[in-house]
Regions:
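Feature recognizes metal-dependent phosphohydrolase scaffolds
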Residues: 1-178
Length: 178
């Protein structure tokens, strides 16, 4: 939430936060695909819409979605999608520790991985935050973001050698690549 706590979200009449929120959202997403009960299936589909667009969605993380405005409105101020406060707090190692603890994780080899968050390398922003506890793995795969980020994205690779963060430069053409 805006004060550094876990936001409380009402899911069908009951408040959830932290890991419990992610658990209940996952349960409903599975119901959207697998439930034989039409009402439970519909609730699951509604939850999928919620996690795609809602301000306190752990997957979306912005105050509003402005897709309509980007296509149909000229006023640039209406197109802004402000990140929720998580993205400021997560820069602090003590907050990253709080999130990790909520999931029963601790130690020097645990990480929070966030995706689909443009990293503005041109402005000096790093995809690694909170002394290495947080890693942002998307820096601009989408061509539309590249002029703002200065990069074509990051990929986190995990193999027998460990974790590797790879930066991708924009692909210009087959001729320049060869």
């Amino acid at each position: 939430d805006d004060y550094g706590g876990f936001a409380k979200v009402n899911v069908y009449g009951r408040l959830y936060s932290g890991k419990a929120l992610l658990d209940v959202l996952e349960t409903y997403v599975r119901k959207a695909f697998f439930s034989d009960d039409p009402l439970e299936k519909e609730k699951g589909v509604d939850i999928m819409w919620y996690i795609w667009t809602a301000p306190y969605s752990p997957l979306y993380g912005r105050k509003k979605m402005s897709t309509f405005e980007r296509y149909f409105v000229d006023d640039e101020t209406l197109k802004t999608e402000t990140k929720n406060s998580y993205y400021e707090y997560i820069k602090k190692p003590e907050y990253a520790d709080k999130v990790l603890k909520e999931f029963g994780l601790h130690g020097s080899r645990v990480h929070i991985i966030n995706g689909h968050v443009p990293v503005h390398r041109m402005k000096g922003e790093s995809p690694v935050k909170s002394n290495g506890k947080v890693i942002m793995i998307d820096g601009g795969f989408s061509k539309a973001y590249r002029r703002r980020t200065g990069i074509a994205g990051y990929t986190l690779i995990y193999n027998s050698y460990g974790l590797t963060l790879t930066a991708h430069e924009p692909f210009e053409s087959p001729e320049t690549a060869v």
